[in-house]
Amino acid sequence: MSLEDAFDEPAFVPYLAAGDPDFESSLAYVEALARGGADVIELGLPFSEPIAEGPTIQQAVVRSLEGGMTPERFFEFVETLDVDVPLVCMTYYNLIYQYGPAGSQPVVPFVERAAEVGLKGFVVPDLPAEEAGPLREACDEYGLDLVFIVAPTTAGDRLERMMEQVSGYVYVQARLGVTGAREDVSDRTAETLARLEAYDVPKAVGFGISSGEQAEAVVAAGADGVIVGSALVDIVAEGHENGDAPDVVADRLESLARELKSGAVAGKQRQPGPERT
């Protein structure tokens, strides 16, 4: 299934850092999200300087790195997963650029390896559209998508450059600032979605969604899906701190996943329909 096909109905797109808090537990957690109704799963390949992340995901990155996660280990993780949903790698450009044997062409070895293990695309928060040419070309060569993050403040000319290169879906930032679960949904979300109506690519809203009610409201505002990270990572962190068994944590993740997916689907029923004459 392609990334765009995953948005045939309102999509639930969860994020977890691969390897948090350890390889085996993380496998179970990702598979629990798939059982809970995930349509696409974003897997974080940890980088030592995660500039786009809030404290919750920063700590997940630390746990993953301390557990031995590396790019090659990440690819092994993807190969080991038993899920039937598209997987997207969320990481930082330095890891993509530096991967591969000495003297190899930058970017291409990482994208080639990603295609080999079955990944469907990338989200690269620190890569401006103006500098994305090499990665876009490699993705085209190996059949992968490149997702960009659009903020409420993204200027029109920069938005145009993003939308010329984006594929799969657009990651719409619901709030300004770094990621993290919030108590409400920004009023600017609908405004940002309205700016994107002219572009024929699914729009998935993230940065702060933590409940089924929020997921419903975001889809009702016109989104094609919701992206949820911090609320799920919080469950992993709490389970790790309390010493809970992985299957217990997995059950909690699956339960929240079902709530979020149900909320997204319910939101579709609230979207304005075509005007009747």
UniProtKB/Swiss-Prot annotation:
Gene3D superfamilies assigned to the protein according to its UniProt record, in alphabetical order: Aldolase class I
E.C. no: 4.2.1.20
Family annotation (SUPFAM superfamilies): Ribulose-phoshate binding barrel
Pathway linked to the protein: Amino-acid biosynthesis; L-tryptophan biosynthesis; L-tryptophan from chorismate: step 5/5
Domain of life: Archaea
One GO term describing the cellular component: cytosol
Disulfide bonding pattern of the chain: none
A GO molecular function held by the record: tryptophan synthase activity
Keywords: Amino-acid biosynthesis, Aromatic amino acid biosynthesis, Lyase, Tryptophan biosynthesis
One Pfam family hit: Trp_syntA
EC category: lyase
Catalytic residues (UniProt): E42 (proton acceptor), E53 (proton acceptor)
Alphabetical list of InterPro entries matching this protein: Aldolase_TIM (IPR013785), RibuloseP-bd_barrel (IPR011060), Trp_synthase_alpha_AS (IPR018204), Trp_synthase_suA (IPR002028)
Catalyzed reactions per annotation: (1S,2R)-1-C-(indol-3-yl)glycerol 3-phosphate + L-serine = D-glyceraldehyde 3-phosphate + L-tryptophan + H2O
Subunit structure: Tetramer of two alpha and two beta chains.
Known role: The alpha subunit is responsible for the aldol cleavage of indoleglycerol phosphate to indole and glyceraldehyde 3-phosphate.
Annotated family: Belongs to the TrpA family.
Protein's recorded name: Tryptophan synthase alpha chain
Natural source organism: Natronomonas pharaonis (strain ATCC 35678 / DSM 2160 / CIP 103997 / JCM 8858 / NBRC 14720 / NCIMB 2260 / Gabara)
Gene assigned in the entry: trpA
